[in-house]
């Protein structure tokens, strides 16, 4: 249908370790994925752009940086840290094993990013947009914040384990969302801290 609109979920993993001189990644940053997932996302991204440009279809790419919520699985570091820290607080376990504590990510709340997706589809022109908070935190920052919220010293419980290191690690992801803010008026409502509070409180309710 000529009136149909489609949103394609692209990913910051498409950038790999390609970073602009100012430390950010944006719509014009070269794509250089370092994982099969990132490579597949680049393929989908380019396919959307090709069909939009060749056939005039309303197709949008949302280049989303890491977005979290209480629904996040514990196979991801935010979900894992939130759950295991709460378990430690409740006396259900006494150790948390993690990989690279120095990797940094631009973490935002899924609720904000879903709003961004919706805004893309309301606009009169299809385009590609980076969705991010513009603030990055290391895994160590994440651990320190979550444990401190639970009145715990993370150094008493967290150990690093090489089995959790990735073969080709993404060291730094931080997005520039100037374009979507200017054109669509999008602004994230959650901070890193309020996002993690949401996840901590959810696990406290589930595990108590």
Named regions from a protein language model:
Residues 37, 41:
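Active-site YXXXK catalytic motif of short-chain dehydrogenase/reductase
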Residues 1-7, 56-58, 93-95, 126:
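Active-site loop of short-chain dehydrogenase/reductase
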